[in-house]
Amino acid sequence: MDKYFPTLPDRVPARGNCLSRNIFKNLFLAQGWHFKGEFPNLPKAVAIISPHTSNIDAWYGFTALLGLGIKITIFGKHTLFKTPLKPLLNWIGVIPVQRNAQQGLTQQIINFINTQAQIWVGMAPEGTRKRAETIKSGFYRIAVGAHIPIVMFSFDYAHKTIHCLGVFQPTGDYEPDLEQILNLYIGKFSPKNPNWLARPLQNRIKK
């Protein structure tokens, strides 16, 4: 059985220590999962992972992230930080944003990215685990606005694999760029719940 698990490259933002990485790496591998693909050595990126069709995606995703020791930044509603969840959100790496701010959510995120020397922003482009009719453009607009690349990952439940699909530098022309991004997923993904697979991915799944 393939037990490949990458070592985090030196320019990628890191978290944790050797002990925590080994614990979560071994937990990830013990579940029969592994990685495929070369992990890019980039200080800044928007990282997307698809398909998102189940809550269990978060479990495999977070055990992989903690095993890698990568620091992924997620943005969430500022009101969540007024609840008992605040310590957990801070530990995960969630940054508060105001959805009704005048400058807009996307621009808030871009502005924050521009203050950081290293940052990987994590996003699920479907925006929901249930079947989405379209892929939300937020991840793309953030990458274009911050002038950073997109790194693509996929869940492949049939083979218990997380694929790293490579790096895509957006041109600013959304529709053709999205087609290229989605085409990189062909043959490299399978959802936990096929009935909830986003429509743009349905005709790209390997039969």
Model-based region annotation:
Residues L29, L66, V144:
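Anion (oxyanion) recognition and catalysis
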Residues D2-R11, R15, L19, Q102-K207:
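Non-catalytic C-terminal accessory region of glycerolipid acyltransferases
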Residues G16-H52:
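Helix-to-loop junction immediately C-terminal to a conserved catalytic motif
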